[in-house]
Amino acid sequence: MRMTRDGKEHEYKKGLWTVEEDKILMDYVRTHGQGHWNRIAKKTGLKRCGKSCRLRWMNYLSPNVNRGNFTDQEEDLIIRLHKLLGNRWSLIAKRVPGRTDNQVKNYWNTHLSKKLGLGDHSTAVKAACGVESPPSMALITTTSSSHQEISGGKNSTLRFDTLVDESKLKPKSKLVHATPTDVEVAATVPNLFDTFWVLEDDFELSSLTMMDFTNGYCL
């Protein structure tokens, strides 16, 4: 029962359509065209709501609907479209001329799914993905392994915390870019000569040469 704008209540019929109701609907559409489905009950006396009239026309009474058996070409097209679009029947039906979304859906559920061996959708998904452990068991395993890692590394963590605390107590040394003194440079010069493969007897440096080399090294 539905309330109209004028305040009157209309009780619409539900269930199967009769031959007389189909004839009334077909005559109305031939005369007035498709659309304005809610006006049919007022103008024809048909005790059906606008939605029911629209679905009845589009799925059964329209001359554009192919009510024959599905061909092999249509089956192949529906299967390929279903792989791309899934259960979006309205989009699939638009690409299958003469078929409605209701026809395509019913034909898939009653014929094609069984033909492809899919059966129940949930069963097919489990078969494709394989048997997996329950999420709860995986969570328990992960938690246990994490606990062992934490327990095993407890001592190292404590030692790291101790080092961090000790580092906080030590004053931070400031980096100072100071120029090395002559004494420091002279102390490092012998180490430089150790890298040269030269005999002391064959090569001697005078004090002046030593100072020149030192000055050049500093620069």
UniProtKB/Swiss-Prot annotation:
SMART domains: SANT. Residues 37-61, 89-112 bind DNA. Keywords: Activator, Developmental protein, DNA-binding, Nucleus, Repeat, Transcription, Transcription regulation. Transmembrane segments: none annotated. GO terms for cellular component: nucleus. The keyword Repeat applies. InterPro entries: Homeodomain-like_sf, Myb_dom, Myb_TF_plants, SANT/Myb. GO terms for biological process: regulation of DNA-templated transcription; root epidermal cell differentiation; trichome branching; trichome differentiation. Residues 9-61, 62-116 form the HTH myb-type domain. It is found in: Nucleus. GO terms for molecular function: DNA-binding transcription factor activity; transcription cis-regulatory region binding. Expressed in roots, seed coats, leaves, stems and flowers. Detected specifically in trichomes, and in the cell division and differentiation zone of the root. Interacts with BHLH2/EGL3/MYC146, BHLH12/MYC1 and GL3. Transcription activator, when associated with BHLH2/EGL3/MYC146 or BHLH12/MYC1. Regulates the epidermal cell fate specification. Mediates the formation of columellae and accumulation of mucilages on seed coats. Controls the elongation of epidermal cells positively in roots but negatively in stems, leading to the promotion of primary roots elongation and repression of leaves and stems elongation, respectively. Ovoids ectopic root-hair formation, probably by inducing GL2 in roots. Controls trichome initiation and branching. This is Transcription factor MYB23. It comes from Arabidopsis thaliana (Mouse-ear cress).
